[in-house]
Amino acid sequence: MKKVASKWMAAGMALLLAVVAGCSQAQPAGTDGTSSSTGTTTPASSDKKETVTLRFATWDTDQMLKIQQDIAKQFEQKNPGVKVQVEAYADGFDQKLVAAFGAKNPPDVMYMWDFPTYNASLEPLDEYVKKDPSVAIDDFYQGLLNYNRFDGKLFGLPAGFSTRVVFYNKKLFNEANVPLPTDDWTWEDFKSAAKQLTVRDKKQYGFAVRSEPDTYDLQQFVWSNGSSFISPDGKAIEGYMNSKETAEALQIFSDLAKDKSALLVGGKNQQSGNDLFKASKLAMYDNGVWSLESYKKANVDFGTVVMPQFPGKPGKGVIATSSVSIAKDSKNKELAWEFLKFFVSSDGIKMRTSDLPVRISVVQEKKLDQDPLYAPFYKTLEQSTDTPAFLLNPHWNEINRNLSAAVNAIMMGQNAEELLNKAVKDSQKFLK
């Protein structure tokens, strides 16, 4: 799964995409001649049947790539005369995709998350969804669909996701006689537990604070305290990024590191939070589903729970998501839609065992919303109703540089209020 906000495209790349897309005036294709349930197409009659090649670009490698290749083969079996060419771009995904769009030779279907950068080169899917009820759009979680919209249009369908939860070591809790956390716990409960679970002689800590945290992930704590980094319309940061509530949410982590009930991790010459949790040197660690299997393999007796809440305020979540989209310059849009639809169908989802299912029906069938380890991810998903900043302002990349510098300094113990005020002042020019 591509973690959202893990990479940002250069401004030149975004400009290139905008220019390229502006030259393309392709219209949405319909879904006439397609099966409503099997993901098959009905080829036009022809004396000579030629193989149609559909290109699918992915950022995945290894086992996840193998699964996607298997999905492609299944689609080919359902659609004789169709060849799905799976193109593994790996770490060069963005560069190769931009080059393909620039050459007007993009893959027909591709993994996607960065809709602010790529939307001008993508095919809006609203009309496809409207004309084709077999996609069962209401079977997707609404929060995931919200992350696939930009400027009022739907540019992708959800493929995989993770929310963030607290992983906790049951053995360490029990040894310290600290009650296991529950879904109604507060930040005061969290801080108390972290302090009790810290045993410095054993180099054991209650929690780990990332010294250079991703501001994207921090949004859920700010939202949960009733604020945000930017206004809902994306036009203001004064009174949002530097609000009392924002500073309070960020200060929690700085204070944990300051009183030594949390260890700073992930920075230069610092340890990995994941490694420490697997070694039972951390009692709690916030993370996504991607670490779950590695914790199992390390034989850690762990549980998961939703993030703590601020008093009298509902908890909020932020989503790391991957989606699939269609290129506006695709010459096989109808077939691309059928493949996209098959990829996010119940069958396609069940094949992608490394991803959390994105369809409500699959989750209920597998009873993941009742599984103690997986239920917190879905409860947090249902709380993920806010829109992340990068989808609200096209200049968020520039604004975020100033915010990130402030956040990193806050984690090192500097004053949150002063640093956030400076970040707002330095970023005002990007809002004009």
Question: Which stretches of residues belong to each language-model region?
Answer:
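Extracytoplasmic/periplasmic solute-binding protein
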Residues: 151, 155-159, 164, 189-238, ...
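Conserved C-terminal helix/tail region of periplasmic/extracytoplasmic solute-binding proteins
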Residues: 40, 174, 180, 255-260, ...
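Extracytoplasmic/periplasmic substrate-recognition and gating elements
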Residues: 73-78, 83, 176, 258-259, ...
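Glycine-centered hinge/linker elements that transmit conformational signals in sensory
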Residues: 194, 235-266
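Short, low-complexity disordered leader/linker segments with a strong preference
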Residues: 1-54, 77, 425-432
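Extracytoplasmic "Venus flytrap"/periplasmic binding protein-like
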Residues: 74-140, 175-177, 274-276, 283-284, ...
